[in-house]
Amino acid sequence: RRANAIAFDLREAGRIKREGDNISGKIIKDSNGNPLRQPGLFKNLKGIGWYIQEYGIAQISYNLTNINVTSLHDVFEKTCERATARGLRVTGSELIGLVPKKVLIDAGKYFLKKQSRSLAIPERDIIYIAVKTLGLDELQPFNQDERIIEYALKNKNNVLANMTLINFANKTSSESPAPGGGSISAYTGALGAALSTMVANLSANKRGWDDKW
């Protein structure tokens, strides 16, 4: 019942208005006798909660119908807040099916900002932060290549960026016209940018430099 109440707090459809207690209070109706509804906190969000007897835990299932309006991490954070207020604790979460990369990138950046950490880290590291903070690996390992749409669709066999350094060098030295000067210059530039970012990240997290963040 408490899990369902949390879902009602957040979902767009909200709950039926009642006098006093949200669960047992008298239903408030309009002039035509129809129950009035109290909207939830988030647009484009459907949700329901129930208790799973065999596991001894409550679960809330959400369906985000527009991730550009309502973000996964905002729903997670608010769920944790409402659960704590009811004496419950969120122990983890699970994604069903595949998820757009943007969802986890946005979540990872959000949590990094909360931790006052640099956002200038590799994309997969940002996603890792999201996975660990959201508890997406609570039930089973979260494989980025299998669970994120963009990674799952990528053809790894024909992408230069997925080559090892040795294979890339060997390919460059072959009779093939590509990779050529452009690829080498781009990679050299990327290494320079990565090194500069490393220095910035080391400085940003240096003890005594918190006020310079």
Model regions and ranges:
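A broad, structure-centric signal for solvent-exposed, well-ordered loop/edge residues
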Residues: P100-K102, P179, W209
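A structural-propensity feature for long, helix-poor, extended segments
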Residues: N205-W213
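Long, contiguous binding/interaction regions
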Residues: R1-N167, S174-E175
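Conserved phosphate/anionic-ligand binding catalytic regions in large, soluble enzymes, centered on
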Residues: R1, T172-V199
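Short, well-ordered loop/turn and helix-capping segments at boundaries between secondary-structure elements
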Residues: E12, A85, A193, T197, ...
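A generic structural micro-environment signature
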Residues: Y51-E54, T70, A178, I184, ...
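Acidic, low-complexity proline/glycine-rich segments
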Residues: L160-T164, A190, N201
